[in-house]
Design a protein with these regions (language model features):
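Acetyl-CoA-dependent GNAT
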Residues: 6-77, 82-83, 95-97, 101, ...
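Short linear functional motifs in flexible/disordered or boundary regions
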Residues: 28, 50-51, 88, 107-110, ...
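Extreme N-terminal starter segment of soluble prokaryotic enzymes
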Residues: 2-4
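Conserved glycine-rich acetyl-CoA-binding loop
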Residues: 57, 78-96, 103-105, 116-123, ...
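C-terminal "cap" of GNAT-fold acetyltransferases
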Residues: 9, 108-151
């Protein structure tokens, strides 16, 4: 099967929000954006949602938004691949597409946070060149904070 990864357009907000909502449930996310906040945060200049699709089915996502109060910084959010599609490199493709956009947009750094029980996510990001850093937000679920310098 071939995976198609692309940046969602405004017409695809509902599909993007649908897969992100699956992520909310799978990761037991406490702080969630409603559809209006989601569209304002992620369907804006310097932001986006990338979707992974197989045979017309959306199977994964990752989001990018500007990190408020920090020049040249973006924040990765909502990386998720449906369980039956994991292990195929889809998360790698999603993050690569997001990083290519971030570099083209002019971001110098990408930040992310994750929960203590998401050790596999932290290892994944470390393999992608992210390093642990100080807390940069007030997310009550996050205990791991990471940053990557973009080239």
């Amino acid at each position: 099967m071939s995976t198609k990864v692309y940046r969602a357009e405004n017409a695809e907000i509902a599909a993007a929000y649908g897969i992100v909502s699956e992520y909310y449930e799978a990761a037991a996310v406490v702080v969630r954006e409603d559809l209006d906040r989601f569209s304002k945060d992620y369907f804006a200049d310097g932001a986006g949602v990338w979707l992974a699709e197989e045979d017309g089915e959306v199977v994964g996502c990752v989001a990018l938004r500007k990190l408020s109060g920090s020049e040249g910084c973006g924040e990765i959010k909502r990386l998720y691949v449906r369980s039956k599609f994991r292990g195929r490199g889809i998360a790698d493709q999603l993050v690569l597409a997001l990083e290519e956009y971030a570099v083209a947009f002019g971001y110098k750094w990408l930040y992310l946070d994750t929960a203590a029980d998401m050790k596999a996510a932290a290892r994944f990001y470390e393999k992608k060149g992210f390093e642990r850093c100080e807390r940069y937000n007030e997310n009550p679920q996050a205990v791991i904070f990471m940053r990557k310098t973009l080239r």
